């Protein structure tokens, strides 16, 4: 789903960074796949893809499928990975990640990479 927005090299980096179950590491993930260099408009496009139900938020069930948006042959996040991802991104505690929270998360994680 992110094809056309991300380069093939970025998609390959996502695959390499998270291939094994339990290997999704939120610290620096976005930098590894090049998202930290994206503009605000590009990040909004990515957010809209991840927000499958188009409600304006990425909920836990959508977050679980986040890696699959990079490439269909990638895996779903484990429950533990999904909960850690949600906890890191849900700054207002409403159980979902809004577009502004998503941008802040990319900034935070990209800066660590």
Curated annotation (Swiss-Prot):
Query: Where N-acetylalanine occurs, residue numbers?
Result: 1
Any one Gene Ontology MF annotation carried by this entry is: calcium ion binding
Report keywords, A-Z. Answer: Acetylation, Allergen, Calcium, Glycoprotein, Metal-binding, Muscle protein, Repeat
Which Pfam families does this entry report, sorted A to Z?
A: EF-hand_7
Q: Where is the EF-hand domain?
A: 38-73, 77-112
Protein residues bound to Ca(2+) 2: 90, 92, 94, 96, 101
Q: Where is Ca(2+) 1 annotated to bind?
A: 51, 53, 55, 57, 59, 62
Recorded hits in PROSITE patterns, A to Z, give: EF_HAND_1 (PS00018), EF_HAND_2 (PS50222)
Q: Which residues form a coiled coil?
A: none
Q: At the top level of its lineage, which domain of life is listed?
A: Eukaryota
- What tissues has this protein been observed in? Muscle (at protein level).
Which Gene Ontology cellular component terms are annotated? cytoplasm
* Family statement drawn from the similarity comment of this UniProt entry: Belongs to the parvalbumin family.
Functional description taken from the UniProt entry: In muscle, parvalbumin is thought to be involved in relaxation after contraction. It binds two calcium ions.
Q: Extra notes? A: This parvalbumin has an isoelectric point of 4.40.
Q: Which PANTHER family match?
A: PARVALBUMIN, PARVALBUMIN ALPHA
Q: What's this protein's name?
A: Parvalbumin beta
């Amino acid at each position: 789903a992110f094809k056309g927005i991300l380069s093939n090299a970025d998609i390959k980096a996502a695959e390499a960074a998270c291939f094994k179950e339990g290997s999704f590491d939120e610290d620096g993930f976005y930098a590894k796949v090049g998202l930290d260099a994206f503009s605000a408009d590009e990040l909004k496009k990515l957010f809209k893809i991840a927000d499958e139900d188009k409600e304006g938020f990425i909920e836990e069930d959508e977050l679980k499928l986040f890696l699959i948006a990079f490439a269909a042959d990638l895996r779903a996040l484990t429950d533990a990975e999904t909960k850690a991802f949600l906890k890191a991104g849900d700054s207002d505690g409403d159980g979902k990640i809004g577009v502004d929270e998503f941008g802040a998360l990319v900034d935070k994680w990209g800066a660590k990479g």
